[in-house]
Amino acid sequence: MNLSNLKPAEGSTKTRKRIGRGPGSGLGGTSTRGHKGAKSRSGYSKKIGFEGGQMPLQRRVPKFGFKNINRIEYKAINLETIQKLAEAKKLEKVGVNDFIEAGFISSSQLVKVLGNGTLTAKLSVEAHAFSKSAVAAIEAAGGNVVKL
């Protein structure tokens, strides 16, 4: 056995269907498209979502909800994250710029501090919003809250 005489196993390959190559091929004439009509022509495509005249799904299902144009979206940062950041950088004041430098947020995002985790460091924390539990935990640790 050499590389020059390798062949696929018997029956493992099929010859592809060559349509539209004359009547002698057995697949000429209509080229497997049936007779006439839009579906037999080149360039045919039906509309996306068309169900043959039946009321399409996107029209059968009712509309719901809306996008509130006044919504203010905050990026959540927990107390445990602030604690780790304060320990790593030995900070007394943690602000939005520290979160940006650490890669937690981008410069255009607003920050909300949430109360998950424990805070032992006495910190002054600056953010755009705070949860009640976060404010309580920061003040219990001897720190203070600065709302931007």
Swiss-Prot record:
Pfam families the record matches: Ribosomal_L27A
Domain of life: Bacteria
Keyword Methyltransferase in annotation: no
Cellular component terms (Gene Ontology): cytosolic large ribosomal subunit
Assigned keywords, A-Z: Ribonucleoprotein, Ribosomal protein, RNA-binding, rRNA-binding
Annotated region (Disordered), positions in chain: 1-50
GO biological process terms held by the UniProt record: translation
Keyword presence, Ribonucleoprotein: yes
GO molecular function: rRNA binding; structural constituent of ribosome
Gly residues bias (residue ranges): 21-31
InterPro entries the UniProt entry points to: Ribosomal_uL15 (IPR030878), Ribosomal_uL15/eL18 (IPR021131), Ribosomal_uL15/eL18_sf (IPR036227), Ribosomal_uL15_bac-type (IPR005749), Ribosomal_uL15_CS (IPR001196)
Transmembrane portions of the chain: none
Assembly behavior: Part of the 50S ribosomal subunit.
Job description of the protein: Binds to the 23S rRNA.
UniProt similarity note: Belongs to the universal ribosomal protein uL15 family.
Protein name per Swiss-Prot or TrEMBL: Large ribosomal subunit protein uL15
Organism: Bacteroides fragilis (strain ATCC 25285 / DSM 2151 / CCUG 4856 / JCM 11019 / LMG 10263 / NCTC 9343 / Onslow / VPI 2553 / EN-2)
